[in-house]
């Protein structure tokens, strides 16, 4: 009998050692996050797409073996389900940027929630999942916005490097201003980078200059989830 019990306890102990631990999300919900926590990582993020320029950006990221995060909008996502699939298939993270790009603090609870759930209804058929990470339009939040994001289980991502690429859409300004902003804020310790894949000069010029600088500094260009220590399973609902 004692020999049998010993075998049972041995089997239970062995099973405990080999059974995977349940998923524990490391990143809190409903709190504004501006910085990566994994050493030597940088998160390039692109808002407002997908757009006609997104395939070119995906090609560029592939050439540099870099991963990025795309915070997408409702209509753009609805018109480009194949690009959403390509993003995920190539190791990038698809995040939520609301359906209509409206300032969330201007809305009540139900309006804020609707902006997120309507976008989920577009993304889920394309990917089979919906994002668990979001970026508020204009980086604007208030306590009600953050409460809704907690209730909907969203991680709220801001930025510590703002390229302001939307203000600098010509060949000179994108380098002299946006890329210089990138360098200055990188030097100051920023590592979550805000840009937009809906703008030609961002994709045609700025993105590659940023990737070259990332490589020169020995940094790893990865997704927001990864730079915060979250595995891919935690990027989605």
Swiss-Prot record:
| Residues carrying a glycan | 176
Q: Where is the NodB homology domain?
A: 40-222
Q: Which cofactor does it need?
A: Co(2+)
Q: Which residues form the signal peptide?
A: 1-18
InterPro entries, per database record: Glyco_hydro/deAcase_b/a-brl, NODB_dom
The temperature dependence reads: Optimum temperature is 50 degrees Celsius.
Q: What is its EC number?
A: 3.5.1.41
Q: What protein am I looking at?
A: Chitin deacetylase
Query: What phylogenetic lineage does the species belong to?
Result: Eukaryota, Fungi, Dikarya, Ascomycota, Pezizomycotina
Instruction: State which gene encodes it.
Output: cda
């Amino acid at each position: 009998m004692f020999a049998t019990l010993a075998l049972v306890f041995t089997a239970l102990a062995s099973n405990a050692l080999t059974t995977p631990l349940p998923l524990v999300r490391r990143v809190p919900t409903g709190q504004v996050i501006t910085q990566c926590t994994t050493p030597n990582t940088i998160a390039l993020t692109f808002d407002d797409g997908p757009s006609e320029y997104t395939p070119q950006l995906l090609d560029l990221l592939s050439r540099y073996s870099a991963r990025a995060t795309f915070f997408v909008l409702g209509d753009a996502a609805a018109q480009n389900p194949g690009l959403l699939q390509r993003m995920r298939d190539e190791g990038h993270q698809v995040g939520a940027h609301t359906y209509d790009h409206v300032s969330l603090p201007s809305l009540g609870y139900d309006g804020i929630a609707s902006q997120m759930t309507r976008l989920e209804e577009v993304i889920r058929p394309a990917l089979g999942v919906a994002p668990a990470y979001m970026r508020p339009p204009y980086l604007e939040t208030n306590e009600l916005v953050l409460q809704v994001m907690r209730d909907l289980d969203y991680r709220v991502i801001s930025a510590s490097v703002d390229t302001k690429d939307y203000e600098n859409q010509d060949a000179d300004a994108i380098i002299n201003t946006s890329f210089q902003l990138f360098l200055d804020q990188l030097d100051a310790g920023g590592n979550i980078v805000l840009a937009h894949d809906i703008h030609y000069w961002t994709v045609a010029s700025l993105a590659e200059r940023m990737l070259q600088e990332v490589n020169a500094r020995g940094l790893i260009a990865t997704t927001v989830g990864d730079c915060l220590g979250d595995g891919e399973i935690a990027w989605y609902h």
